[in-house]
Amino acid sequence: MVSNFHLPPVGFGPGSQPEGDEELGYMQLPSGMRTYSAHLPEVEDSSAVTPALKLLDEIAAGAEACARGGMASFDLAGLDAQNRALIAETMGQGEVAMKIRGIPALMVQESVFAGVWSVAGAGVDRIEVGAVPAAALSRAFEPFRKGQTALPPLSDGVVNAPALIAELFDKSAAYVGGAADVINLTLLPHTEEDLTLLDYMLGEGAVTILSRGYGNCRITATATPHVWRVQFYNSTDALILDTIEVTTMPEVALAAREDLEDSAGRIREVLEAIR
């Protein structure tokens, strides 16, 4: 005889849930995301900062033009201390920072206006406007640590790295622009020895990028042309996505056309408020 009685589902009923002061161990989720809020520099006498205001107007026009493609550069060396300070205060610090090795070594900080970059180094003090600073493209794959072309003797823990390396070398040699080829290491079975071998074979390039926001993204150029390591971390610094991209520049580092158009408008709003 078939019984009409059914057991309750697992996880329901007395004793299935924590009681009293027992705590639940929830994973911590991202708690916030940066958003733009206008900062208006305090200027007592706008006539004393005419060069800075003129430059900001030119930067806004440059952002508008670069939204259609290309880059623009504005040298800050000719500004006196007061005008230079106004530029620095207006630019602020955005979510993307870059370290570019080479001569001269460069530190890049995106401003609060997306696509407007402060570039500093020995003898270098300028603002660049565009999807990404020029040196981040031209120097990216200059070897800080050379990659290798021949596999070394393989350790016991190596499983999938040789096949991935062969695929990446082929994609690197064939890449002529366009859409990125992405290998998602998070979804592929691999060992620590695989990662060590990949790092050894690909080498390390000249550009490291950190994008902060809803978690962090670390982008590292390898010494293999067009090959980037792109790693996403949550707000607790746990690695949640690990990829290798074959592309000119990973999209996550680029300011979009809409970003540049928006930046042009916001810089002009600041100018109007100061004047």
UniProtKB/Swiss-Prot annotation:
Lineage: superkingdom: Bacteria
Transmembrane segments: none
Renumbered residue ranges of the record's region Disordered: 1-24
Family designation: Belongs to the HupH/HyaF family.
Protein name in UniProt: Hydrogenase expression/formation protein HupH
